[in-house]
Amino acid sequence: MPGMSTLRIGTRGSELALAQTHQAIAALKAANPGLECSITIISTAGDQRTDIPLHMVNSATNTGDKGVFIAAIEEALAAGEIDCAVHSLKDMPGVLDSRFELAAVLPREEIQDVLVMKADANEDKLVIATGSVRRSHMVHTYWGGKATTVPVRGNVATRLRKLVENPEVSATLLARAGLNRLGYDRDSFEVEGTQVRIIGLPVREFPPALGQGAIALECRKDDALAAEMISRVNHLPTYRCISCERAFLNLLQADCSVPVGGYAEINADDSITLNVVHYSDATHFTRLSETGTDPEAVAVALHATLIRA
């Protein structure tokens, strides 16, 4: 099959999205010698509607079941304006539109959430900014009466700026993967002259969003050439884990706005374990795990247990 000279890649325009896209391009070029890549920046509903909570953006923008950070990029993919879309996997709904396929995932970064806290904050009386329903529920479970939450929207840089500019807020919650990719891979740093420190949260007690830490590369199902080239960068251990996590999301008919956290991990015997915390409301949750050899079968079994719980 003759090669493709230039792969047109669509992505969001945030600093993190572009960092992830450049990481994907480096992998694609290494796996496909001679390949050139171009970047098309696409503004999504999630980027445009920062005036409302994230879980309300779907209904406000008529994006339906599609992820608010991917629908516009998929439209460009369907129209043939781009050949490949690069996403944060956690932003993707459990089921893709039948016109597209998840051609590859890059090796997964650290999956945990972290608390980014002002250095002088009172740890016994935290005010934590988050736009995530999942994180908000988990704050109350993890810290109890020592923490309250306030809403915030925006990319990593915006949330860090809002943290240091608001004297009433003592901390915010972010994915460690995103901070690492932006160069904040240390225990403390300055934001506009204010010292902040990073506290990693244990994944069993404060589980991440399903799919967190993984970068996804999506293409059209009918584009065999792009799919072949992209598949060369696929990291199979990560793909097994995210396949299990996404199968569970599909069974829940959930997306990134649903209050469920968890992660899959591959064991020494090559079996896979899916660990999940599902919130029915802010104070009631179910913690479950399931182990097996087939990622989708593990997800089905855990979902059946959740239904019976």
Please annotate each region the language model reported.
Residues 2-52, 56-63, 136-138, 142-309:
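Small-molecule-sensing regulatory modules
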Residues 8-10, 85, 103, 129, ...:
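Short, well-ordered beta-strand segments
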Residues 52-83:
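Short, structured active-site "lid" loops
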Residues 78-92, 212, 216, 220-223:
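Ordered, amphipathic secondary-structure segments that act as subunit-interaction surfaces
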Residues 83-84, 101, 114, 126-127, ...:
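Structural motif
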Residues 89-147:
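A conserved helix-loop-strand patch within extracytoplasmic ligand-binding domains
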